[in-house]
Amino acid sequence: MANEKPTEEVKTENNNHINLKVAGQDGSVVQFKIKRQTPLSKLMKAYCEPRGLSVKQIRFRFGGQPISGTDKPAQLEMEDEDTIDVFQQPTGGVY
């Protein structure tokens, strides 16, 4: 029975994780597993770096609202399998 309690604690710990989808403008969807209390900057960097993008060039939105790197899934009341939309910030322009 003593072994059962740590197993239950591990299950509770797994509830601290959330699976999030990040949807790009090109229709691609990437899934991330992140702790509910982890700042979203970690997810943002993990999305941008393999694509050769700077976090400063990209805008992340959840439910139509902009999110920042200091936001956490728990703060934004994100649920498992929620989707974060990614938009490339327009740069420059000639008139």
From Swiss-Prot:
One of its GO terms (cellular component) is nucleus. GO terms for biological process: cellular response to oxidative stress; negative regulation of DNA binding; negative regulation of DNA-templated transcription; positive regulation of DNA binding; protein sumoylation; regulation of canonical NF-kappaB signal transduction; regulation of protein localization to nucleus. It comes from the Eukaryota. In contrast to SUMO1, SUMO2 and SUMO3, seems to be insensitive to sentrin-specific proteases due to the presence of Pro-90. This may impair processing to mature form and conjugation to substrates. Keywords: Diabetes mellitus, Isopeptide bond, Ubl conjugation pathway. Expressed mainly in adult and embryonic kidney. Expressed at various levels in immune tissues, with the highest expression in the lymph node and spleen. There is a cross-link at G93 (Glycyl lysine isopeptide (Gly-Lys) (interchain with K-? in acceptor proteins)). Pfam families: Rad60-SLD (PF11976). Residues 17-95 form the Ubiquitin-like domain. GO terms for molecular function: protein tag activity; ubiquitin-like protein ligase binding. Residues 94-95 form a propeptide. The keyword Transferase does not apply. Ubiquitin-like protein which can be covalently attached to target lysines as a monomer. Does not seem to be involved in protein degradation and may modulate protein subcellular localization, stability or activity. Upon oxidative stress, conjugates to various anti-oxidant enzymes, chaperones, and stress defense proteins. May also conjugate to NFKBIA, TFAP2A and FOS, negatively regulating their transcriptional activity, and to NR3C1, positively regulating its transcriptional activity. Interacts with SAE2. Covalently attached to a number of proteins. Belongs to the ubiquitin family. SUMO subfamily. It is linked to Type 1 diabetes mellitus 5: A form of diabetes mellitus, a multifactorial disorder of glucose homeostasis that is characterized by susceptibility to ketoacidosis in the absence of insulin therapy. Clinical features are polydipsia, polyphagia and polyuria which result from hyperglycemia-induced osmotic diuresis and secondary thirst. These derangements result in long-term complications that affect the eyes, kidneys, nerves, and blood vessels. PANTHER family: SMALL UBIQUITIN-RELATED MODIFIER (PTHR10562). This is Small ubiquitin-related modifier 4. It comes from Homo sapiens (Human). The lineage of its organism: Eukaryota, Metazoa, Chordata, Craniata, Vertebrata. The gene is SUMO4.
